[in-house]
Amino acid sequence: MSLRFVIGRAGSGKSTLCLHEVQEELKQRPRGETILYLVPEQMTFQTQQALIGSEDVRGSIRAQVFSFSRLAWKVLQEVGGASRLHIDEAGVHMLLRKIVESRKDGLSVFQKAAEQNGFFEHLGSMIAEFKRYNVTPSNVYEMWQQLDAHSSSAEQKLLANKVYDLQLLYDDFERALIGKYLDSEDYLQLLVEKLPQSEYVKGAEVYIDGFHSFSPQELEIVRQLMICGARVTITLTIDEKTLAQPVNELDLFYETTLTYEKIKQVAREEKIEIEKTIPLMEQPRFHSPALAHLEMHYEARPNEKFHGEASVTIHTAANLRAEVEGVAREIRRLVAEENYRYRDIAVLLRNGESYYDVMRTLFTDYNIPHFIDEKRPMSHHPLVECIRSALEIISGNWRYDAVFRCVKTELLYPLDVRKETMREEMDEFENYCLAYGVQGKRWTSEDPWMYRRYRSLDDTNGMITDSEREMEEKINRLRDVVRTPVIRMQKRLKRAGTVMQMCEAVYLFLEELDVPKKLEALRIRAEENGDFLFATDHEQVWEEVMSLLDTFVEMLGEEKMSLSMFTDVMSTGLEALQFANIPPSLDQVLIANIDRSRLSNVKATFVIGVNEGVIPAAPMDEGMLSDEERDVLSAAGIELAPTTRQTLLEEQFVMYQMVTRATEKLYISCPLADEEGKTLLASSFIKKIKRMFPDVKDTFITNDVNDLSRLEQISYVATPEVTLSYVMQQLQTWKRYGFEGNLDFWWDVYNFYVTSDEWKQKSSRVLSSLFYRNRAQKLSTAVSRDLYGDKIKGSVSRMELFNRCAYAHFAQHGLSLRERDIFKLDAPDIGELFHAALKRIADRLLRENRTWADLSIKECEHLSAVVIEEIAPLLQRQILLSSNRHFYLKQKLQQIIFRTSIILREHAKSSGFVPVDLEVPFGMGGTGSLPPMEFSLPNGVKMEVVGRIDRVDKAEDENGTFLRIIDYKSSSKALDLTEVYYGLALQMLTYLDVVTSNAQTWMKKGGTASPAGVLYFHIHNPIVEVKGDASEAEIEKEILKKFKMKGLVLGDADVVRLMDNKLSTGSSDIISAGLKKDGSFSARSSIASEQEFNVLQKYVHHTFENIGKDITEGVIDIAPYKKGNKAACTFCNFKSVCQFDESLEDNQFRTLKDMKDSEAMEKIREEVGGE
């Protein structure tokens, strides 16, 4: 029994010496004693390859490469102890979830923390750390007693409570494992116990290579190997000079020096012979003098400079994507020009979450075979999502999001259906569920779902059309596709008495859905597309899910568990599942994390993402215990993993390892911006390398080839997929600035695309965008007639929409596009309710031959409640009755109608105008409808403007009959003559024209009526600010002012007094007008003469004719208006359709100049030739 150290700096040949010794021994004595070659998990594959890589050794039974966990499995297979069930990380998390849920009420710190994402991952890591450092539950309990007895500050009490919680959970976890299960850390503890019994290990030659430190648990294994084996050889990366000096925590080799001393101490304790250390002083790894210099003088202060040509390259990139593309181009150059194999190249990085997706895309585009050494979670795989969402459906009462997350996995689809068709149907089905607010018991009820197109509150026709019946049948068929398998599982879960029966319910759910066959189809399709890595995912995920169910049953099978806890535990297990990474080929670029990689035999290393805070890493205090808490535990004798401070001290060694992996070339790069454009800083580490290699230039990498010389641009011509974007870049330059001399070879590249049989069609789609103009071509007369017909019938709102943006009109009325209907109460629904409520009250008053003035406050309140109760079941598929929240909203809307009724009562008392008709249709056909506003357009097309007028009021005096329009609005609005001029506000003047043109409808003896005005009535329940001693009458007066109607009224003092009979001088509280003492109107009055009203009505006719002409002639310009801070695009539903983009020359707003009313009126006169 002996111990031997092989030490040396990085690249000194430690591993090579050990491998040569083993290979020589195998040649001399192929059937001798066992040779164990122990390496970290990440090194096992490459070490096995190196061991049998010589021509003299093609295979071996005597020598085996192991990791600690693999050796444990081997020994336990030999001597026993492996019969207990192994639980993996997912099983550990599930067991911990169950323990936490059962212990929740007794936990102090972790009761709420358990609901946070990642909690069980941290808890599992903490328990694993306890085990690796030989800390038992009793040790933790003793620590708690000690802390609890001496806790005085809040921080100390928090730590004591945290340690108490950890002790409870750790103890429960260990009790659950005893005699039945083994987790990964238990294997190592069992290995320590069983090694003395192993004949396989007894007398073995042991090599331990590639480690820099050992946990206490691993150190115990090393102890037993020294006792049982013939000789143990351990390699450590240490400079021999370091061993001759006192241990200094700032030394580069501090960590490995401590490891060296610990192992020697173990050897002394066990009286193991310590052989003479073998120091290796040469640098055989490095074929480059520069890399040898970097390794030898890495820690020197001040930095030792290397002059001359160096094989170290530094790049600064404009952004992350440019950096990765630069790496890809250089890899292709090394392979093409310097005869590198892809396996000779490695890319090292730390913040993989920022890089991996970009690297997958770009390396694929550059045709670079690559393998990313990272564990990918299974949580996004359709199978995992299907199980998780299906359980959420059941435990969460069939919520919309859970249902359609499950649907979109496509595993609920029948096996024999065409997926494309099913997707389209499910999209329609989802739209129905959104529109009808389907959730909860409606899914499980046997009552068939109804389908009716929602039209209006007045539509009480119960007849169902054929198309509605057909849609109804489809919806109920799709409902059964979705709900039937889930309901079956739901019933089984409710009947289940044990966890085993609940797991069986999940398994039967998957089996009845034919999930194995569906996953096989996905695997075949992935292989056909060349995605071999992802093809294996579908096999792995089924095996892992089955293993998870088996583990669940083995651990908790006979226990009873609530559905909610079962869902939580299952979800925790599913979240922990990960894909095993199996390299699909041997010749590929390895992409690995700096902290986990153990590279060897690479010629070129690319270290990317070398930014401040990343390399070296910024301090990160994460996990269950903070650094301060770890220090407290360490002072009390509990050794745990290194603190952040210790980790930072080890960072220099990590970076030293990072830059000494390559034998020939080292590339270091950093981006100056991330994918979102956020600024990043270069690391201080790059400055250090620059000081060591002052002759090395920092090369800037950009995506814009225009900034480069012709020779540099040639390197950007790579694969056809990649180069196409740069061709586009050059052609854009040509288009903007004309031909330049350095574009000539790009024309050759362009010619390749347009003449290549393979690329001609593909490139044409991309190259056509060069001449892309986001301009809507005018429709032909034939197409316009097909879309709109020979007779146009449209509302005033439609005409206004055309003037806001012709393309929006085309999208809505030509293509009939609309947003999907959502089961929610929007402003239009509320507006519709207000109109309907006020109409019902007014209709009742007309039937009873009463006016608003006749109502009492109590009657206003009663009628408001009655009409809201009548309307609520009719509005938006009974939305106001669908939930407590909507019921509360119904009460608020009732209060608004009540307040509005009171104001209408006050208005009626003060006014000579009375409502004579409500919701007056024109051009709608049927009894009671006024005729439409008709136009014969120059191209022969007939156009009718139709609509519905909220309220028509009439007043009479000795001067004649006057009619006015009242329009109810749920938001404040005034009539802007500038908007009238631009055709954006035509509604009120159109209504006034219609009623005055058909005045005989409301005249007892026939005759004509004059226009009295148009007013907007704002329906709301305002809040007013008053002094604390204000009387009730003063408060009511202030409220009345908030309801002042804005608009345009006839400039006749008598007519204005008819609207507000309390007005003598001053401003009216009812309308936007006021009188001076001399009887003239105040400056702020919104008035127009009768002649001006006539001009406005002529202008409205003129505008409609122009709109009709443009519609029928196919005008669909993408030309939205902009006036001040108002723009057509602000609330437009079709922005994603027109893709209006101000950065394009063709896409600019029609900027409308704001004008005073007098200026606008003058322009209107000019247009119609009015006086």
Swiss-Prot record:
Keywords: 4Fe-4S, ATP-binding, DNA damage, DNA repair, DNA-binding, Exonuclease, Helicase, Hydrolase, Iron, Iron-sulfur, Metal-binding, Nuclease, Nucleotide-binding. Binds 1 [4Fe-4S] cluster. The keyword Hydrolase applies. InterPro entries: ADDB_N, DNA_helicase_suAddB, DNA_helicase_UvrD-like_C, P-loop_NTPase, PDDEXK-like_dom_sf, PDDEXK_AddAB-type. Its EC number is 3.1.-.-. It comes from the Bacteria. Transmembrane segments: none annotated. Coiled coil: none annotated. GO terms for molecular function: 4 iron, 4 sulfur cluster binding; 5'-3' exonuclease activity; ATP binding; double-stranded DNA binding; helicase activity; metal ion binding. Residues 1-343 form the UvrD-like helicase ATP-binding domain. ATP binds at G8, R9, A10, G11, S12, G13, K14, S15. [4Fe-4S] cluster binds at C805, C1129, C1132, C1138. PROSITE patterns: UVRD_HELICASE_ATP_BIND, UVRD_HELICASE_CTER. It holds the Pfam family ADDB_N. It is an enzyme of class 3 (hydrolase). NCBIfam families: addB_Gpos (TIGR02773). HAMAP family: AddB_type1. The heterodimer acts as both an ATP-dependent DNA helicase and an ATP-dependent, dual-direction single-stranded exonuclease. Recognizes the chi site generating a DNA molecule suitable for the initiation of homologous recombination. The AddB subunit has 5' -> 3' nuclease activity but not helicase activity. Belongs to the helicase family. AddB/RexB type 1 subfamily. Heterodimer of AddA and AddB. This is ATP-dependent helicase/deoxyribonuclease subunit B. It comes from Bacillus anthracis.
